[in-house]
Amino acid sequence: MKFSDIETISHGVSDYLADNKIVDMTEIQRQTYKHIMDNRDIIACSSTGTGKTLAYLIPIINRLRRDTHNIQAVVLVPTAELAIQVNNTLKDIFAHMDNTLTSAALIGDVNISRQIDSI
């Protein structure tokens, strides 16, 4: 299945995928997309480099409202390195959008005031 087959995908996400030459969905992305869009909880497992981050970020982004400044999603990850990676991916995707969405990585053992200010 190709990302272009998804009718609900936002233009910004489509632009990000095109710029990164990502055309086909990976197995983990195909298996999880509809469940996440249907607001269902999932537990999925896949090897490194199979597209897990985009498997959950793309449907989350497609569900976000652009007319509010409230926190709409929280992604909880087990390590600071993964938090930074996920946040960088979000920032890359948001750069292809209308600048109404923002993200921040909040990491333990780091100055919380500065992190809160980044939200």
PLM features per residue range, with description:
Residues 1-45:
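Conserved pre-motif I regulatory segment
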Residues 8, 12-16, 69-119:
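Conserved nucleic-acid-binding Ia/Ib motif block in the N-terminal RecA-like helicase ATPase lobe
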Residues 23, 61, 65, 83, ...:
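Nucleotide phosphate-binding site architecture
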Residues 30-42, 53-68, 89-94:
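Walker A/P-loop NTP-binding motif
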Residues 46-50:
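The conserved Walker
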Residues 51-53, 110-111:
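Gly/Ser/Thr-rich beta-alpha loop segments that engage phosphate groups in nucleotides
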